[in-house]
């Protein structure tokens, strides 16, 4: 291929993302803001090379769309360093630490890879004592932290298996195994466990402990294929797919431990996985908090036993822990009665009993009883929002402008016809004579009954009640803003976002409001004691 042919070679968005080690969304953003220039309306290799060479040091890297590129590492160069280190006298543990610390945040985010801290590995595996003749698998072994701990526990290295797609990590794991045991393992395989699993379907393991990729970007066709292969239902995030794949390779009476994103335990898309987990005998649920640098998501682990001969009973107890803060026991059966089978294990049994009682009261919900609208995304607040009102501009409000009894004075203004905005819902909902505005990013419900047809940015959302809804706007706002409802919301969902799906599952006590104009804790206690 000539230099000219090389430079004019057409490059797809996917190929560009792979070359620059970023998401396709970042490529689209760079094209949209003009940072990445197309040639004749398509990308060429020269466009990519020019961007790589000229844009990396540009001041434009401070913009949100480009933050992912700022900490990009050269993986080929890093791989050469690791291969050289593997042949040296440097210990495998040191190489492992060097490799993990050299991976950029953008790479880890793209691959869904966050290497498990040693204290979490030890804590998750602390109860393993029966090791004679037992087999162990880590299907996403990384540089081998769980695998090395299994060998330290006494599991024979010949019976320890691992998969990982990262060749560097696989070779580091093999070196560490040899250093700790003298055994040169052929059981650590560089392959995608989700696809490789089908080739090892007859092999089962006594112990499977792992930290699977969280939210790794895989194409839709593969995602649906894996979902069908492992019967994962609606749970198709990579962490859930690995859970179902692992379950198929676990022996009867085998034990499984997985470190998951906290969303696994409370978000609707993981409900099928939670239902499956509740058929196992769960021994521990542990919240390790924000365990990974640069990641806001909490890391939460479960440890459970697959025992068809001894299904969970009404007496089955789970040790629930906020790591190094508190421990308490919860009935496993109790999670079956929580909306969406959410694992709200941060609360104690007596609090869950109150939740069960509350949901037994006559109630309706907002599901199918309201129309919903997301807040407006301008795509560029600095350009489209003004701090002073001029002709043709109207107020637009943020989540932080929403209070229980008022809206803050307007401080931003936008073109009345919302021209140029990236996301706009049905204007009929924004301009409804009655609607409820609520904060989106918040750990408590804060909502306001709006009668002035206000616009809101996407840090707030809105909904409009159906005409036949039996509770008035003022009554509903008094309930949703109450300390009681916020306690209930926090106890069930335990999230920093106010999601529509969660609001739709809150109980609205329509019978109570037949006798009460607004909600109050005192009158509700009387109503509850009479109704139960």
Predicted features and spans:
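Conserved SAM-binding strand-loop segment of SAM-dependent methyltransferases
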Residues: 182-193
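Signature of N6-adenine DNA methyltransferases within the class I
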Residues: 2, 35, 119-120, 141, ...
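Polyanion-binding surface elements
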Residues: 2-24
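Short, solvent-exposed alpha-helical "recognition" segments
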Residues: 6, 32-40
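Polybasic, glycine- and aromatic-enriched phosphate-binding surface used to engage nucleic acids
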Residues: 19, 24, 29, 354-532
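Residue-level detection of the helix-turn-helix DNA-binding "recognition helix"
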Residues: 29-33, 175
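Class I S-adenosyl-L-methionine
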Residues: 2-7, 44-180, 197, 266-273, ...
């Amino acid at each position: 291929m000539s230099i000219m042919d090389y430079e004019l070679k057409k490059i797809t968005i996917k190929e560009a993302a792979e070359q620059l080690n970023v998401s396709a969304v970042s490529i689209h953003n760079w094209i949209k803001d003009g940072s990445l220039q197309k040639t004749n309306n398509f990308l060429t290799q020269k466009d990519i090379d020019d961007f790589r060479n000229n844009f990396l040091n540009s001041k434009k890297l401070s913009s949100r769309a480009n933050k992912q590129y700022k900490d990009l590492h050269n993986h080929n160069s890093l791989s050469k360093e690791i291969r050289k280190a593997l042949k040296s006298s440097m210990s495998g543990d040191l190489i492992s630490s060097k490799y993990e610390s050299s991976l950029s945040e953008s790479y880890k985010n793209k691959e869904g890879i966050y290497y498990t801290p040693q204290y979490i590995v030890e804590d998750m595996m602390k109860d393993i004592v029966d090791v004679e003749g037992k087999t162990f698998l880590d299907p996403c072994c990384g540089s081998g932290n769980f695998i090395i701990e299994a060998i330290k526990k006494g599991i024979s290295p010949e019976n320890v298996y691992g998969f990982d797609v990262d060749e560097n990590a696989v070779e580091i794991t093999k070196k560490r195994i040899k250093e700790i045991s003298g055994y040169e393992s052929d059981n650590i395989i560089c392959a995608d466990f989700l696809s490789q699993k089908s080739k090892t379907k007859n092999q089962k393991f006594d112990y499977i402990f792992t930290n699977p990729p969280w939210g790794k970007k895989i194409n839709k066709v593969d995602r649906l294929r894996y979902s069908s292969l492992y019967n994962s239902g609606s749970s198709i995030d990579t962490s859930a797919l690995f859970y179902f794949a692992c379950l198929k390779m676990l022996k009867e009476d085998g034990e499984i431990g997985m470190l998951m994103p906290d969303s696994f335990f409370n978000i609707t898309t993981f409900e099928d996985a939670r239902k499956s987990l509740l058929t196992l005998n769960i021994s521990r649920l542990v919240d390790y908090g924000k365990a990974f640098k640069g990641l806001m998501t909490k890391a939460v682990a479960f440890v459970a036993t697959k025992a068809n001969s001894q299904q969970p009973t009404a007496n089955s107890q789970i040790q629930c822990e906020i790591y190094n803060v508190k421990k308490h026991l919860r009935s496993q059966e109790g999670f079956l009665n929580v909306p969406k089978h959410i694992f709200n294990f941060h609360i104690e049994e007596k609090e869950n009993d109150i939740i069960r009682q509350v949901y037994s009261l006559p109630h309706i919900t907002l599901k199918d009883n309201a129309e919903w609208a997301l807040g407006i995304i301008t795509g560029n607040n600095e350009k489209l929002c003004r701090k002073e009102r001029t002709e043709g501009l109207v107020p637009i409000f943020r989540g932080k402008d929403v209070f229980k009894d008022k809206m803050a004075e307007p401080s931003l203004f936008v073109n009345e016809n919302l021209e140029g905005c990236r996301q706009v819902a049905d204007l009929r909902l924004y301009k409804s004579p009655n609607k409820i505005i609520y904060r989106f990013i918040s750990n408590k419900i804060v909502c306001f009954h709006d009668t002035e047809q206000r616009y809101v940015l996407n840090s707030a959302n809105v909904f409009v009640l159906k005409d036949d809804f039996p509770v008035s706007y003022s009554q509903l706002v008094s309930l949703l803003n109450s300390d009681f409802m916020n306690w209930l919301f926090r106890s069930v969902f335990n999230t920093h976002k106010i999601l529509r799906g969660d609001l739709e599952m809150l109980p609205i006590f329509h019978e109570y409001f037949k006798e009460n104009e607004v909600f109050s804790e005192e009158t509700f206690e009387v109503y509850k004691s009479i109704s139960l």
